[in-house]
Amino acid sequence: VEILKGSQSSVYGSGAIGGTINITTKKGTKNQKGDFFYNTGSHGTNNISISKSGEKLNTNYLVSFEKFQTDGISAMSHNEEKDAYRNNSFLGKFDNQFNDYLEIEGTVRLRDTYLQYDKVIDTATATHNEEENGRHYLASGALTYKPNKKFTNKLSLTSSYTKRSYGAAAGSGNSIKDNYYGERYSYGYMGNYNLNLDNSLIFGVEREEDQIGYNKDLTGIKRESYYTTSSFFDYQKRISNNL
């Protein structure tokens, strides 16, 4: 995990104009490897993780599944209602090095969540039975072409979808179910040309398309959409080894 402050648009696109958190997942290694992890704790807490990684025919791969759940605790002074949480996630990742010039990589991530929480309600008799169901998927792919050691070209495509449903429960602050949806598609090209050891150029273009939908109180889905197209150019020069 890498936290970068300040504008990072020249490297990570227009969405990183105020900074970015760069999370790099593990790649498969040459040796076949399988991992199993399980722990448990109080309040019905259980966590299990299974993963498999390796390399075959110049292709690195990683497949993992994780399940976390807990019954939660009650922080309210007038009832014993606990706030449970569940998170099931799947990750698949591959990287294929065709030759010295061409590489392709892809990632698929799925997540299913359930959350109970206490909403601020001004009545002491409320049971605070708020709950949220969430589903999220992300798929991304990238093609990298290096015609020579100085010039690197990268085409990328990312698609994501999120759905959040807030359930209606007796004594809660939500009397009718609410649904919220979000979709994002991102397309981009980035080029990196190293003129020499001290000078380099970074340039590219990116387009992001966002669509949102909400169905509050089941009154009908309302949709909105927008897009952003951006280009960037960055020249970097190293004056000395320390500057």
Segments and roles (model prediction):
Residues I3, V11, G15-F37, I48-I50:
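N-terminal periplasmic accessory domains that precede
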Residues I3-L4, Q32-D35, I73-H78, N88, ...:
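Extracytoplasmic loops and strand-loop junctions of Gram-negative outer membrane beta-barrel proteins
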Residues G6, T24, F37-H43, E55, ...:
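Outer-membrane beta-barrel pore domains and translocons
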Residues S10, N22, K30, S51-E132:
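Periplasmic-side early beta-strands and strand-to-turn transitions of outer-membrane beta-barrels
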Residues G15-I17, N39, G44-I48, R86-N88, ...:
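Residues that define the transmembrane beta-barrel architecture of outer-membrane proteins
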Residues L62, D95-T113, E130-L243:
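Face-selective signature of the C-terminal outer-membrane beta-barrel domain
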